[in-house]
Amino acid sequence: MSYTLEEILRIPALLENLKDFKFDFSKDKSYLFVGCGSSFNLGFIAKTLLNMNGYKADVITSGYVMLFNKIPKSDVAILITRTGETTETVKAAQTIKNFGIKTIGITCAKDSTISKISDESIILDFAEEKSVVMTGSFVLILALLVNGINKYDFSEESKKVLNSSTEVIDKLDLSKYEHFVFLGYDENLGVSKEGALKLQEMALQYVEYHEPLEYRHGPISRLTEKTLVVINSKDNLEEKKLKKDIEKLGATTLEISFQGEIKVPNFNGFEIPLRLIPIQYLGYKKAIQMGYNPDTPRNLSKSVKLE
């Protein structure tokens, strides 16, 4: 079994360990999420969910902080780096500290640089991954942050979503598809962005991500029978109309929603960690179908370190 698959399948076990961790957000403080790649996408989702629930939050790439020394006004910066060694994030942490902002590092590595330089750190070393691609640890960290707003037992629900994901995706003839599109609003746009990244990283595919109703305004011109459109839906009527329109044009749709082909529970947006499971598994399956090793994608390393 590949490391990537193993790290996806162990997600329910990872989530079971959340009971040992506590992280609470306050509406009296403003938060800034900082990260690169998947960690930035994670911060984007968390920031969006916080804003939707009356909290003040922003998100920025570590590289932007490193290059331009500009930081949105905030009380607490949450720096996410799976390895704790990503150059841009480590340098961003030091810059942010120089601005007098409290820093919290979230990582899956013991004794990492980010945990040493941050004012506080959350170390989820039981979720450390051997694969280059971030999967289970992404779901875990996002669930930790979600529980900082509202508490949920994601472990049992994740088993259901994982079973549904493997059952549905295993039936797809992925060799038919050469173009992948991910659609979603609000926090689901962040999931779509991450879904696109998973297909790029693991399976080297041509991908797009958009808000659903924006898709008709140009991007739909590339739609063919070789396109798979993944809709992270909020189960509204207009998204359902779009799904039918896409199918009429010959493409295939895969809906992840409360009533979709892959079902997730309705937690008013807080189910968001569970929506990552099917897109991660889809990336893995497409990589295998293409004959690629999802554990070690081309041109990528587990941690980006700049000279």
Language-model features, listed with the residues they occupy:
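A cross-family phosphate/adenosyl-ligand binding-site feature
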Residues: 1-14, 104, 129-137, 268-277
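An N-terminal, well-structured beta->alpha segment
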Residues: 1-29, 162-164
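A short, charged, Gly/Pro-tolerant segment at domain boundaries
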Residues: 290-307
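Glycine-rich phosphate-binding loops that contact phosphosugars or nucleotide phosphates
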Residues: 23-159, 165-166, 185, 228-262, ...
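Structured C-terminal subdomain patch of bacterial secreted/periplasmic proteins
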Residues: 264-293
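Acidic catalytic cores of enzymes that act on phosphate-bearing nucleotides/polynucleotides
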Residues: 178, 182-254, 262-263
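A general structural motif
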Residues: 15, 160-168, 207-217
